[in-house]
Amino acid sequence: MKQYAIQPANLEFNAEGTPVSRDFDDVYFSNDNGLEETRYVFLGGNQLEERFPLHPRPLFVVAESGFGTGLNFLTLWQAFSQFRDAHPEATLQRLHFISFEKFPLTQADLALAHQHWPELAPWAQQLHAQWPLPLAGCHRLILDDGRVTLDLWFGDINELTGKLDESLNQKVDAWFLDGFAPAKNPDMWTQNLFSTMARLARPGGTLATFTSAGFVRRGLQEAGFTMQKRKGFGRKREMLCGVMAHALTFPSPTPWFTRSGSAKRDVAIIGGGIASALLSLALLRRGWQVTLYCSDEQPAQGASGNRQGALYPLLSKHDAAINLFFPSAFTFARRLYDALPVTFDHDWCGVTQLGWDEKSQHKIDQMLSLALPDALAVAVDPDQAQQETGVATHCRGITYPAGGWLCPAQLTAALLALAATQGLRRHYTHTLTALSRQATGWQLQFAEGKAVEHEVVVLANGHQINHVDQTRPLPVYSVAGQVSHIPTTPALSALRQVLCYDGYLTPQNPATHQHCIGASYHRGSEETAYREDDQQQNRQRLIDCFPDAAWAKEVDISEKAARCGVRCATRDHLPMVGNVPDYDATLAQYAALARQKDAAERAPVYPDLFMLGALGSRGLCSAPLCAEILAAQMSEEPIPMDADTLAALNPNRLWVRKLLKGKAVK
């Protein structure tokens, strides 16, 4: 997945107003009655109306081979809403839809196509509002107040199938095998696709497709489905239906990165910042009982306590994991923040990252070579940079139009207050000192002398994440930093975007008439006392980067107003999300991993102990998606990320990489 931007669909609308693919010379849906055909072929062919009331789990998972206009998804969503209205007490509470699309429609074409079905407008409008950018990989959309989740995988389905994480195995309750007709698009209808459908299908899972082509039926049978023909819709004579009648087994290609969830639903989250708050909401949405323990007297006293934090993605020319994770995380964060029913100071004013010297300009050129969509990242020359930011820097750079700033302290407090209305229990001044495994879960020991037990524990407590025995060996480190709060001036008030250089400067917050400028960097330090040297350096870095900018010299730090925080980071600039690995057992079990990969077993982890940390300086960007990934993993649901990137987020990755090369772990 080295190609990050995706080509949008090349289509036209025929005389009936139906979208037609120019590339495949085929309609996206029937000219006659596409809506009724979807209901008959996919909902009827999978017997969903009969299965929903009897479904034994709270989540029903549907996967689809071609999203197209989203007609199948919208029709299913409508039917699911009607089912929930009629059966509010049913076990089934949520719908999860996974779909693949090589050439996604533009937002404008999508809206035009949806004009065909005014009865679907209430659902279509929600889809339009969250329609993602044409970026490769998985885009998770949380819809209908969390009752419906849509995972849109952009890219060639036969390439993506090899990149899906094994946690998707046997998760799909029903398959919609859709797409342009086999004669029009033979590249999609492959044995590889049929085998992937079988791998992902739950025992008892079903499939339906509009075609009755013999090679499709035989291919699905070979993959493991029991197939039968059914009368086709309208003038079509036949269609195919199938069922996965037995459980297939598949060896893990990378058992050292296998993720495990939990069958339990009582969890203690340790922390009080943005990651803890977002994870609390994600787990509550899935029916967990959540209790939060925070060492401080109130939330957001650590790295999440700043007045203004910048929101923009981290990019790297040479690191595929960073370039897949952070754009996905950034776009997910914007969708989530925009949909939150809480208020917090923010401004999506854009972020401009400037090349102030030859080295930084080269770095920006490398980022621009990724050819991301302009709506995500676009080059600006010095004049354009001045036009975007409102101030003259005489530097070129890269602008993130959808970026901006927000107040993490306000957001965190608002999220935890929202979670409390949904059942979150909060305990402050609880400093975790030890964890011990019990027969039914974990005992948590606090510095204040209190001990409690919970079935599951998540460590999301920032730089304190490695302060218990189980996590002490983790290769993470603390970084102390000071952010200066400066009063605005007429010249500084002209700044319209967040400015990033060898530091950062935010536009003024209208509520405080102050800017934030930062931040100092002290690796290995957890010191939070005010430092005058840091205050001076924050100002001087701005002046050094833009020596000809008179406005930069107006920065006034004489009030000694600042905030000092500590963040947790890793050497590879990626978060750690997943099971807490057992260090000693990992080294013992994988001592000969470089020579015995084929015989490797699953990596040893502490059961029902998870972590979400090492968010570094991009926590506002990465925390929403990390929380969603971990909540999905813990709940044994589909995870919105490809296998390679999930491996790059695994807390054991730095050890395993060395062991795979036969190197010692120190």
UniProtKB/Swiss-Prot annotation:
Entries under Pfam families matching the protein: DAO (PF01266), Methyltransf_30 (PF05430)
CC per GO annotation: cytoplasm
Molecular functions (GO terms): flavin adenine dinucleotide binding; oxidoreductase activity, acting on the CH-NH group of donors; tRNA (5-methylaminomethyl-2-thiouridylate)(34)-methyltransferase activity
Compartment list: Cytoplasm
Cofactor: FAD
Gene Ontology biological process: methylation; tRNA wobble uridine modification
Primary localisation category: cytoplasm
Residue ranges of the region described as tRNA (mnm(5)s(2)U34)-methyltransferase: 1-245
Region (FAD-dependent cmnm(5)s(2)U34 oxidoreductase): 270-666
Cited HAMAP family: MnmC (MF_01102)
PANTHER family attached to this UniProt entry: SARCOSINE DEHYDROGENASE-RELATED (PTHR13847), TRNA 5-METHYLAMINOMETHYL-2-THIOURIDINE BIOSYNTHESIS BIFUNCTIONAL PROTEIN MNMC (PTHR13847:SF283)
Official protein name in the record: tRNA 5-methylaminomethyl-2-thiouridine biosynthesis bifunctional protein MnmC
Species of the source: Citrobacter koseri (strain ATCC BAA-895 / CDC 4225-83 / SGSC4696)
Lineage: Bacteria, Pseudomonadati, Pseudomonadota, Gammaproteobacteria, Enterobacterales
